[in-house]
Curated annotation (Swiss-Prot):
NAD-binding protein involved in the addition of a carboxymethylaminomethyl (cmnm) group at the wobble position (U34) of certain tRNAs, forming tRNA-cmnm(5)s(2)U34. The lineage of its organism: Bacteria, Pseudomonadati, Pseudomonadota, Gammaproteobacteria, Alteromonadales. Disulfide bonds: none annotated. Its main location: cytoplasm. PANTHER family: GLUCOSE INHIBITED DIVISION PROTEIN A, PROTEIN MTO1 HOMOLOG, MITOCHONDRIAL. The gene is mnmG. It comes from Shewanella sediminis (strain HAW-EB3). It comes from the Bacteria. This is tRNA uridine 5-carboxymethylaminomethyl modification enzyme MnmG. NAD(+) binds at residues 273-287. Its cofactor is FAD. FAD binds at G13, G14, G15, H16, A17, G18, V125, S180, Q370.
């Protein structure tokens, strides 16, 4: 049985990858179908109620710069906003928001339902139609066939998903949802390498049974950050606090006592879990010398009493979960609403993908999200947007596009996955990007929005707002460069008291702003130096571009020179333990492989470009930077 219409692009799955993929293809004019097993759960936040953070916030800003929905929905759903690393440099500053699950889901669904060229249909997909190495459509569980020359698969944790709580396990895509067994079996027939991964979630706690007075309150920032470049503080709902508490030795003893019934430690779970978001039982085992671990008590919404205790993800039996929760300060009388669990699922080796996220073996079939071995809403959303965009470009007969590593964290993400693959759930960090000073949150629109408009991802309203901001930045930079203060200028009467060293020679306003004791608001507040830009985000951009211009240019030069280090030699006797900044994982790989050149090192599976940059700096400092004649 065939559906009565043909489509250009079909997207399977309605999570963060699927929604961004469907919206991207539809924005570009492709007739798009989004298939999901349950329309009511479109945009569901399956795990933690938060968007953004270190590295992840950068991806959200890039999705937004390319016209995506995640940042907009977060502004309408965020009940606490914070800028992380605010005291550090702009490269590692990141926006994070606690989100009301219901508000976030509702906003995503509103955006989907009002998107031209997009059709929603509720049916699980059981089969792919592949003819002569090309995908031509899909078949749903009731035997209904939909035809399209491009299919984006965003199955999340649903492919042969298995949920574990203690020694009990059952099939499921997530709590309350069925797995995709038939589709998983079909995908196993494809010439793509497959593996199993694991992730988990903590028990949800009844807020009415928590004593918040015994915890440390954590308020949001003032003034409130905004996630979207076209967002506004007025979009934010009522703001609330989070709280912080800690595990203790009694907690750890309870966990150790339950490990014999842990599916992780009894060999029942075979999938590899996320290194940087371990379960509480994994933390206790890996960091046995630590007497406590921090737990963030996060509200799940304004109209629910459910609390997400970030930091105690677990698959221990329910009785152990309850005891460990009640051993924590402030939760002595806590009641669990939903037990924590682990889930195992199929993923496919992303090295079998092109950087467009199209599979190398089947034309027109694209993968995005956790199916590619990543973890996190933000990583999924970014991949979804890229896959949906490239599916649409292919249907239109145009070349695919993926940003380079020096253009976007999205480029870093895709390059890492498609080049190196992953054996564990991959999450984004700023440390994965070797050019992170160029890839800041604040300039994501300046890096990507013009390209997004050319491709068709960015609408005219966003494009107009972007051009207004970009023009104001350029004009202000020109003004600062063209206006000067001379040693005999009357402006010095108000300026010199603000400077560590008085002006003794002529200086441009730009030179003054470069001084460490001066910032843009202070300079503009002085009589004769204003007026300041009204747009605070444009003003921030002016300050960063001026103050970091030398570093930015240096990093741009590094990009231009990067390809020249292919044959740079690495001494075989080099002690990688002595190289500051290398992770233990990277040190182990280098000691195991003993590469002769930087080029060889860069191709070791799991070797990060950031680690290569660290090696180059170390070689230069030790006077060891030389070409390997045997490799020239």
């Amino acid at each position: 049985m065939h559906f009565h219409e043909r489509f250009d692009v079909i997207v399977i799955g309605g999570g963060h990858a699927g929604t961004e993929a469907a919206l991207a293809a539809a924005r570009m004019g492709s007739k798009t179908l989004l298939l999901t097993h349950n329309i009511d759960t479109l945009g569901q936040m399956s795990c933690n109620p938060a968007i953004g953070g270190i590295g992840k916030g950068h991806l959200v800003k890039e999705i937004d710069a390319l016209g995506g929905a995640m940042a907009i929905a977060t502004d309408y759903a965020g009940i606490q906003f914070r800028t992380l690393n605010s005291s550090k440099g702009p490269a590692v500053r990141a926006t994070r928001a606690q989100a009301d699950r219901a508000l976030y889901r509702a906003k995503i669904q509103e955006i989907l339902q009002n998107q031209p060229n997009l059709r929603l249909f509720q049916q699980a997909v059981d089969d792919l139609i592949v003819e002569n190495g090309k995908v031509t459509g899909v078949v749903t569980q009731m035997g209904l066939a939909f035809e399209a020359p491009a299919v984006v698969l965003t199955a999340g944790t649903f492919l042969s998903g298995k949920i574990h709580i203690g020694m009990q396990n059952y099939s499921g895509g997530r709590a309350g949802d069925p797995p995709s067994i038939a589709l998983a079996d079909r995908l196993r027939e494809l010439p793509i390498r497959i593996g199993r991964l694991k992730t988990g979630t903590p028990p949800r706690i009844d807020a009415n049974t928590i004593n918040f007075d015994l915890m440390t309150e954590q308020k949001g920032d003032t003034p409130l950050p905004v996630m979207s470049f076209i967002g506004d503080v007025s979009h934010h709902p009522r703001q609330v606090s989070c709280f912080v508490t800690h595990t203790n030795e009694r907690t750890h003893d309870i966990i150790r006592g339950g490990l014999d019934r842990s599916p992780m430690y009894s060999g029942i779970i075979e999938g590899v879990g996320p290194r940087y978001c371990p379960s509480i039982e994994d933390k206790i085992n890996r960091f046995a010398d630590k007497s406590s671990h921090q737990i963030f008590i996060e509200p799940e919404g304004l109209n629910t009493n459910e609390i997400y205790p970030n930091g105690i993800s677990t698959s221990l039996p329910f009785d152990v979960q309850l005891n460990l929760v009640r051993s924590i300060k402030g939760m002595e009388n806590a009641e669990i609403i939903r037990p924590g669990y682990a889930i195992e699922y199929d993923y496919f080796d992303p090295r079998d993908l092109k950087n467009s996220l199209e599979t190398k073996s089947i034309q027109g079939l694209f993968f995005a999200g956790q199916i590619n071995g990543t973890t996190g809403y933000e990583e999924a959303g970014a991949q979804g947007l890229l896959a949906g965009m490239n599916a649409s470009l292919q249907v239109q007969g145009k070349e695919s596009w993926c940003p380079r590593r020096d253009e976007a964290y999205l480029g870093v993400l895709v390059d890492d996955l498609s080049t190196l693959g992953t054996k564990e759930p991959y999450r984004m960090f700023t440390s994965r990007a070797e050019y992170r000073l160029l890839l800041r949150e604040d300039n994501a629109d300046l890096r990507l929005t013009e390209k997004g408009h050319q491709i068709g991802l960015v609408d005219e309203d966003r494009w107009a707002k972007f051009n207004k901001k970009r023009e104001s930045i350029e004009l202000e930079l020109q003004r600062l460069r063209s206006q000067w203060v001379h040693p005999n200028s009357p402006l010095l009467e108000v300026l010199n008291p603000e400077l560590n060293t008085p002006i003794s020679r002529e200086a441009s306003f730009e030179d003054l702003l470069r001084r460490p004791e001066m910032d843009y608001p202070k300079l503009m507040s002085l009589e004769g130096f204003g007026p300041a830009l009204e747009d605070q985000r444009a003003a921030e951009q002016v300050q960063i571009q001026v103050k970091y211009s030398g570093y930015i240019q240096r990093q741009q030069d590094e990009i231009d020179k990067a390809i020249k280090h292919e044959t740079t030699g690495l001494p075989l006797e080099l002690d990688y333990q002595e190289v500051p900044g290398l992770s233990n994982e990277v040190i182990a790989k280098l000691n195991d492989h003993k590469p002769e050149t930087i080029g060889q090192a860069s191709r070791i599976s799991g070797m990060t470009p950031a680690a290569i940059s660290i090696l180059l700096v170390h070689l230069k400092r030790r006077g060891l930077l030389r070409k390997n004649p045997s490799k020239s």
